């Protein structure tokens, strides 16, 4: 699996590499949500361990896009590669299309430094405090980094 290729695909291209399933949503929302197939689930055909679903919207189209976004984030969180040399500068926001790839690269750098944020910051060419701000802006990333640090016997990072 070429992680960076998958993370850079458009929704249409990624959809072609997935099995898309649609079903009725659950919970509040009334007739539109409970009586039509608005919930979406995307399963990566190359590796069916990677699957994401969404039923937060009343639109099947938006739920499909959200499920694909969640799938990209899952791939970025779980698939580690050697960090790119030199590591890319992380400049985009959490809703930008390039964010999952940047997220994966940040985790690659952290993994290569045994989750030492100061060493990872030096590799990325930013200060440790700036690197922590990049990590802190995404709650799921912050939790992933802290759980990985704990697994290695390191203390949790604290937010300012």
Go through the PLM ranges and name each one.
Residues 1-107, 111-113, 124, 136-139, ...:
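Ribosome-associated translation termination/rescue signal centered on the conserved GGQ peptidyl-tRNA hydrolysis loop
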Residues 115-116, 120:
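Short helix-boundary/capping micro-motifs
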Residues 131-132:
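Helix-turn-helix DNA-binding helix
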Residues 143-145:
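Short, Lys/Arg-enriched C-terminal cap helix and immediately downstream tail that follows
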């Amino acid at each position: 699996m070429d992680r960076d290729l998958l993370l850079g695909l458009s929704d249409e291209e990624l959809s072609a590499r997935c099995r898309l399933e649609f079903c009725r949503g659950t919970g509040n929302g009334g007739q539109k949500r409970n009586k039509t197939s608005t919930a979406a689930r995307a399963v990566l055909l190359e590796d069916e361990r990677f699957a994401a679903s969404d039923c937060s919207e009343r639109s099947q189209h938006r739920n499909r896009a959200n499920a694909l976004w969640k799938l990209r984030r899952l791939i970025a969180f779980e698939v580690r590669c050697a960090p790119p040399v030199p590591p890319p500068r992380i400049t985009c926001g959490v809703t930008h299309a390039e964010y999952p790839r940047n997220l994966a690269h940040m985790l690659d750098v952290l993994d290569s430094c045994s989750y030492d944020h100061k060493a990872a910051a030096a590799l990325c060419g930013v200060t440790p405090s700036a690197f922590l701000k990049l990590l802190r802006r995404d709650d799921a990333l912050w939790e992933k980094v802290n759980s990985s640090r704990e697994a290695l016997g390191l203390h949790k990072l604290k937010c300012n």
